[in-house]
Swiss-Prot record:
Keywords: Disulfide bond, Hormone, Secreted, Signal, Vasoactive. Its main location: secreted. Belongs to the natriuretic peptide family. InterPro entries: Natr_peptide, Natr_peptide_CS, Natriuretic_peptide, Natriuretic_peptide_atrial. Residues 1-21 form the signal peptide. It comes from Anguilla japonica. GO terms for molecular function: hormone activity; hormone receptor binding. This is Ventricular natriuretic peptide. One of its GO terms (cellular component) is cytoplasm. It is found in: Secreted. One of its GO terms (biological process) is negative regulation of systemic arterial blood pressure. The lineage of its organism: Eukaryota, Metazoa, Chordata, Craniata, Vertebrata. The keyword Secreted applies. The gene is vnp.
């Protein structure tokens, strides 16, 4: 009876092993999915940016015609003044960054933070662990490090 209980306990432990195993959050597949998500966010941000951007030079055709007509009688001082006015109008027309764009940038930044912590303890602990051979990434490319000279 005791033997069957031990065998049954071992069998249950083997079955439950997959459920209890560690599943790192930022493994290769998840990082790749985050990169794909980042690309999609950038594409969406570009589309939103095209729809939101105000017209920077709305009167460019009128300005060309005026420039051709007044080309003969413009003084350099008046030309500088008109350029300064044009630059000030452009600055006034450019809208500040919208909350939607900042959200997209925040979401895109998640992939960067995920890459920096792609192991068990983070980059600093990986460096410490790689020297001692006890870290999460001590077994890379199928080669084993020897801790002691055995």
């Amino acid at each position: 009876m005791a033997k069957s209980g031990i065998y049954l306990g071992c069998f249950i432990l083997i079955l439950i092993q997959n459920m209890v195993a560690a599943n790192p959050l930022f493994n290769r597949n998840n990082v790749q999915e985050l990169e794909n998500l980042k690309d999609l966010i950038h594409q969406l941000e570009e589309r939103v940016a095209v729809n939101e951007e105000p017209e920077v030079y709305p009167e460019s055709e009128d300005m060309k015609m005026d420039a051709e007509e007044e080309d003969a009688g413009i003084s350099p001082g008046a030309l500088r003044q008109s350029e300064e006015n044009l630059l000030m109008n452009i600055v006034d027309r450019i809208a500040p960054e919208s909350p939607l764009r900042s959200r997209f940038r925040d979401l895109a930044g998640l992939a960067k933070t995920a890459k920096s912590f792609n192991s068990c303890f983070g980059t600093r602990m990986d460096r410490i662990g790689s020297w001692s051979g006890l870290g999460c990434n001590s077994l890379k490319n199928g080669t084993k490090k020897k801790i002691f000279g055995n």
